[in-house]
């Protein structure tokens, strides 16, 4: 759906990382973890295109505290990396946005008996919070959160409040274990061989490493990808990624916006 | 006042209003059906179709530029057979003319494709892309050389009796000469413009941003060039023109009509606002009503010099 | 690290840094002297000069468009005599190369003007505008036909021994052919691009906004087209190129250099920020220092494909 | 000069008319009435060009009430007519602008013994307030303010506080006399034949009528013009207007930005 939204709050949770809460119509609660929103930052041509962000959280204000009935909202967690996110970060309570949501295919929850392993790299953590909230209702959930340094480690307390066991690592060792999140994950898997499935979001090299791990350990694994997007609805073919059957002779392109952003790792070509 | 008349006609294709969706920016219509009423727009122009499925270019395929965007999709498409099997059934349920945008890698492919499309009753007309700057095998040559263009147009003309629209490239010295060649070879109408060839560079990586190196520039940035070309062609000859390029609002659309366009296409705007085409059509109606204009056709070419 | 070397050379004109100001957007330098240090930029290119004073077009002459602007100044200028009498004395006091942009209404005027400028020691080089889309008597023909261009360039070449830069129009099918014709006829360097021809319309008045109907599109909107043309020409031949079109920042300038430009010109950006040229030059220095690049010349044509 | 400025206040003084106060360096006090500023509304490409506005007022905060020393400020009075002014109107205290000021040639004060007649049409009133402030120090000042309707009549009390005698007229008679401001002026001049000089700012047809009146009554008369501007400093030649000697053979174009915006009416060609 397309809707007008009002910024409720927009808080810097770590240097250059913001968490923004905005109003959304009640139907937003049907969004599946892993789905995303496309935000039109300004009603002007600069920036021109919408910017995609994972859904970090959803909710409804309790009626006791507002006069406006049950106001639903959604949240994004974003990193300021360029013009669009810079402009977003300067918005205040009461400013307006135009939103498309929920878009794409989210995570499949899978067998509740499986332990759920979430792997987030940097701001890739964003869609994993809403996912953790859903998964934690029926399953045991662990989070492996990695970043380059301690500033990239976000909202760990929020995950812990859900009962999620968290494992933090940073490339430079400024917080948690020192090293890549995938190294920490691999170590954990070597020790704990129970049934589990993986859910990963982060930079492409990390996802590729996670897919490799899933393959070696024969685990179910879903990854959430990023791509430059224009339409967000599968029309422009700007955001495609190679599907498992892709070759120059037999093209098999998938739209990250529509067929994804979440894919089972086996469905993609990882070269 | 009575409701203003928004209908226009392009070489026999009757449109309830002049606002169509531009090829490649609106998929096969269905992708946008959650966001607007497909029966409130003038026509749907489908993604550039080829004889066989086509993979298109490697990624990145798109990048934002100041006031516009570059794309080098490379005409990825499902091919005519899958189009008929998978896309047409939905389009058949929508009471809005469907115009198929097509291209060939060779002269023969253009003809063969036009022949196949000619047999489909759901197809209201053909829009032939001789202007796509991304495919080296043909597009660029047909679109920038009047003789080559005339050859394609002539062949397609002989292959179909459906209304034949030729889509022109802006990457030429003299668009009127190209227009003239196409009309003489049998085009019923002209769409202009397709994208301007451009490039974007990533300074830090020292690489072109698009995998294809260059791409087609669309969006508000190109509107002045598009308006100028529509006006030039409309001054030079009497052929129905479909104006395209950076149309974001009803005002933009009406400016193209004043410059001589009978109808318009909305492209990049669909990405900013998936309901853009409907909003623009409604905005045109509003404008006419507010200004006491009973028929949108009064505005076609009504620019005073 | 030592201060990076920003100097470049265009056919014998030594520039302290690669950032010049584009003709027509910077007057005769003096107009901007309150806002920047004219001795911190690479060169000043003066407003298009003709043999006799020229009135230019009626107004409106400018209008903003999405991400750009149209101008149809019509080459209003003081003429060579007033230039020598009124403008050169100030420029003589500034220790920065002055390149004179010139145009003629006829072939002969180009030659005569070049001869007169050849005699002025203050003039470091000539930039010949064969691409202005606003003057019907000549500009447009010389700029879009390779033979006519070669003729002008040849004549000017015989009329001056100063470095000879030819400024190309983007309104052509094949910019490489134009570039080739100019270089073969004796051009030392090429500036590209001049403005794209465009148009803007006032819906309510049903009139073109510019009195001249069409005008030249400049600003960020055209940057992708400019980058593409610089890259195409730099791939095709070994001639110093000056990149122009929508440069607003040091990043933009460096992208043009990666694409093959030896230097750049800043045009429309001077209107947004009268200190733009100096800011961009300083930004280039910063970038080099931060990235450990000792010489800006390393970046020329360093794009990896 | 070029300077960064902070919005101090931005108040709607009449429907669609805003008065904005912003910080300026101390040198701003040297601005001459009739000079103008060019505002870069946003550090983005939409809108692309700066927007010109007359200087409505200047001043310095009294040091007693601030801790920041003697902060100088300038004010503009503007009407929302399009994209740029729309965006301006949404700015708040604390937002930033980039300003060029003071630009152009202002009004010549003339002989203090002359009575000063100010003629403002709509938002053309803007530069006349700062002018009235200066003129009222040494001369008798009258203001003729016209508009289409009562919403277009601005800040009359402010003028009256300076001791200016005001004459209001509207085309539709919703405030003051009914009719064109130039008709009211003409009537006044027929009755009062003392030495006086005219200072006018408003739409071109009004200025033309005022110039005609000045000619018939043989009065000194300065008019402040508007034009589309790009550079604001006399470089682009976008803003030109025909000077008195203009003909196709002998071009005499003046830059509104640099040779104006204020001209003695005889220096221009009024066809
Ligand atoms: C499905 C999806 C979900 C996303 N979820 C989040 C999220 O929850 N939080 C978050 O902070 N970011 C998320 N992103 C990335 C986010 O969309 C980009 O960071 C943002 O669009 C950058 O906009 P900008 O204008 O600030 O940067 P720009 O100025 O456009 O570009 C700055 C740099 O950011 C990178 N970039 C720009 N656009 C994208 C893009 N679409 N995908 C990947 N990289 C890009 C490029 O490397 C570019 O050099 C998501 C992207 C996708 C596709
Ligand atoms: C020297 C000078 C002083 C001015 N002082 C004031 C002032 O004190 N208060 C005030 O409200 N306005 C003033 N103006 C006019 C003001 O600059 C324009 O209203 C403003 O630039 C419009 O910007 P916009 O983006 O809102 O409108 P746009 O969207 O750019 O255009 C909307 C409409 O406004 C008109 N317009 C746009 N730019 C100009 C312009 N430069 N000159 C005249 N008309 C224009 C056009 O008719 C256009 O159709 C002045 C103009 C000049 C040249
Ligand atoms: C992502 C994208 C894909 C496009 N694909 C096609 C295509 O397949 N065939 C075609 O004729 N034009 C194609 N175009 C060009 C558009 O139809 C249109 O001519 C152009 O974008 C200018 O209009 P706009 O500025 O409104 O976008 C494409 C444009 C974009 C942005
Ligand atoms: C107002 C204006 C006047 C111009 N006058 C000239 C001119 O006299 N001669 C010329 O060769 N180019 C002229 N140009 C073109 C510029 O020099 C430059 O090529 C063009 O604006 C593209 O650069 P930009 O996008 O940085 O502005 C003019 C451009 C503008 C905007
Ligand atoms: S963003 Fe357009 S198809 Fe995915
Ligand atoms: S605005 Fe550029 S010369 Fe006046």
Curated annotation (Swiss-Prot), chains B, C:
Q: Note whether Cytoplasm occurs among the keywords.
A: yes
Q: Which SUPFAM superfamilies does the UniProt record give?
A: FMN-linked oxidoreductases (SSF51395)
- Enzyme Commission number(s) of this protein: 1.3.1.14
| Record's subcellular location | Cytoplasm
- Swiss-Prot/TrEMBL catalytic activity: (S)-dihydroorotate + NAD(+) = orotate + NADH + H(+)
- Can you tell me which residues bind FMN? 23, 47-48, 101, 129, 167, 193, 219, 245-246, 267-268
Q: Name one GO molecular function term.
A: dihydroorotate dehydrogenase (NAD+) activity
A GO biological process of this protein is: 'de novo' UMP biosynthetic process
The pathway is: Pyrimidine metabolism; UMP biosynthesis via de novo pathway; orotate from (S)-dihydroorotate (NAD(+) route): step 1/1
Q: Where does substrate bind?
A: 47, 71-75, 129, 194-195
State the UniProt keywords alphabetically: Cytoplasm, Flavoprotein, FMN, NAD, Oxidoreductase, Pyrimidine biosynthesis
Any one cellular-component term (Gene Ontology):
cytoplasm
What cofactor is this protein dependent on? FMN
Which branch of life, at top level? Bacteria
- Co-factor binding comment: Binds 1 FMN per subunit.
Q: Cross-referenced Pfam families, in alphabetical order?
A: DHO_dh
| Location, primary (coarse class) | cytoplasm
Q: How does it assemble?
A: Heterotetramer of 2 PyrK and 2 PyrD type B subunits.
> Per its database record, what is this protein's job?
Catalyzes the conversion of dihydroorotate to orotate with NAD(+) as electron acceptor.
The record's comment on protein family reads: Belongs to the dihydroorotate dehydrogenase family. Type 1 subfamily.
Q: Which PANTHER family does the entry mention?
A: DIHYDROOROTATE DEHYDROGENASE (FUMARATE) (PTHR48109:SF1), DIHYDROOROTATE DEHYDROGENASE (QUINONE), MITOCHONDRIAL-RELATED (PTHR48109)
Q: Which HAMAP family match?
A: DHO_dh_type1
Listed NCBIfam families: PRK07259.1, pyrD_sub1_fam
**Protein name (record):** Dihydroorotate dehydrogenase B (NAD(+)), catalytic subunit
Q: Which gene encodes it?
A: pyrD
């Amino acid at each position: 759906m397309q809707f007008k939204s009002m910024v409720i709050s927009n808080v810097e949770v770590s240097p250059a990382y913001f968490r923004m809460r905005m109003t959304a119509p009640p139907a937003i609660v049907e969004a599946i973890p892993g789905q995303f929103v496309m935000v039109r930052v300004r009603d002007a041509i600069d920036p021109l295109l919408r910017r995609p962000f994972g859904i970090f959280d959803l909710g409804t204000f309790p009626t006791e505290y507002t006069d406006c009935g049950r106001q639903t909202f959604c949240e994004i967690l974003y990193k300021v990396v360029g013009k669009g996110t810079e402009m977003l970060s300067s918005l205040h309570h009461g400013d307006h946005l135009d939103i498309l949501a929920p878009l794409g295919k989210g995570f499949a929850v899978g067998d509740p008996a499986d332990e759920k392993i979430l792997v987030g790299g940097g701001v890739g953590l964003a869609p994993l919070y809403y996912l953790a909230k859903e998964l934690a209702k029926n399953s045991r959930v662990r989070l492996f959160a990695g970043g380059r340094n301690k500033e990239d480690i976000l909202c760990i307390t929020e995950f812990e409040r859900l009962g999620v066991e968290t494992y933090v690592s940073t490339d430079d060792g400024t917080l948690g274990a020192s090293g890549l999140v995938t190294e920490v994950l691999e170590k954990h898997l070597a020790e704990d061989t129970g049934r589990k499935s993986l859910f990963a979001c982060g930079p492409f090299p990390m996802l590729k490493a996670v897919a490799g791990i899933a393959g070696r350990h024969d685990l179910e694994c879903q990854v959430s990808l990023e791509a430059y997007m224009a339409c967000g609805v599968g029309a422009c073919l700007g955001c495609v990624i190679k599907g498992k059957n892709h070759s120059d002779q037999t093209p098999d392109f998938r739209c990250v916006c529509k067929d994804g952003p979440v894919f089972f790792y086996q469905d993609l070509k990882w070269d | 006042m009575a409701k203003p008349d928004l209908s226009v006609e392009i070489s026999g294709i009757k449109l309830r209003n002049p606002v169509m969706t531009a090829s490649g920016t609106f998929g096969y219509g269905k992708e946008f059906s959650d966001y607007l009423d497909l029966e409130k727009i003038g026509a749907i122009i489908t993604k550039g179709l080829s004889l066989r499925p086509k993979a298109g270019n490697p990624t990145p395929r798109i990048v934002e530029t100041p006031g516009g965007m570059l794309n080098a999709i490379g005409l990825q498409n499902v091919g005519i057979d899958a189009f008929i099997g998978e896309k047409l059934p939905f389009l058949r349920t929508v009471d809005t003319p469907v115009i198929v945008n097509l291209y060939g890698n060779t002269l023969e492919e253009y003809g063969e494709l036009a022949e196949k499309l000619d047999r489909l009753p759901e197809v209201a007309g053909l829009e032939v892309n001789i202007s796509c700057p991304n495919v080296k095998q043909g597009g660029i040559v047909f679109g920038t050389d009047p003789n080559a263009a005339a050859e394609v147009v002539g062949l397609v003309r002989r292959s179909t009796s459906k209304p034949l629209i030729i889509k022109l490239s802006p990457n030429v010295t003299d668009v009127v000469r190209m227009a003239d060649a196409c009309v003489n070879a049998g085009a019923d109408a002209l769409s202009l413009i397709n994208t301007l060839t451009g490039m974007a560079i990533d300074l830090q990586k020292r690489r072109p941003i698009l995998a294809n190196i260059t791409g087609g520039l669309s969006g508000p940035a190109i509107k002045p060039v598009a308006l100028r070309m529509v006006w030039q062609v409309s001054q030079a000859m009497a052929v129905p023109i479909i104006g395209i390029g950076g149309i974001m609002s009803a005002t933009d659309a009406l400016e193209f009509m004043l410059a001589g366009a009978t109808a318009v296409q909305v492209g990049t705007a669909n990405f900013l606002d998936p309901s853009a085409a409907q909003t623009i059509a409604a905005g045109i109606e509003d404008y006419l009503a507010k200004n006491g204009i009973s028929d949108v056709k009064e505005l076609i070419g009504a620019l005073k010099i």
